[in-house]
Amino acid sequence: TRARMLVEKTRGRKTLSIINDRPDIAVLSGADGVHVGQGDLSAKDARQILGPHRLVGVSTHNYEQLNKAVLDGANYVGIGPIFESRTKQFSSFGGLSLLEQVANQTALPVFAIGGIDIQNIDAVIEVGVTRVAVASAITAAAGIKWITYSLLIFLFFHYISYKLNFNYSLFYSFFSK
């Protein structure tokens, strides 16, 4: 199956294989975990299927959902949508203010989700979140490898600049064009 192929390609690398929405397939494929949305199984139910050693991530859109994910045993949360997304349609956006507040409220790793691309990733990082989930930023790009590496390098330089108080403006102006 495609899930098993994904898991095999990530084995032995510094990469996790996370299956979307389906904890049963995560178990059968040997994946590292599952990511569930608000319309899927709860983190608690996913945990019962996965057991204690696999990761459970949950997409959240507000504080109530975040708190439920934490209580249900999620290992990480996605917060969003931060910006308008080409992948999924939402009637409202939590935006950067929700992202910043949530990131400061929980000890769980927080991933920003929704409409994130090379043009706005700096705004996400500036509110203190250095983990992102992207889809259309990569799949809609003319050069998939180039944009993927650009996003990774951008995250790396932002992290270094944050830790070392380094000015990355020249780097940003090169990669954001």
Regions found by a protein language model. Name each.
Residues 152-176:
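Hydrophobic alpha-helical signal peptides and transmembrane signal-/tail-anchor segments
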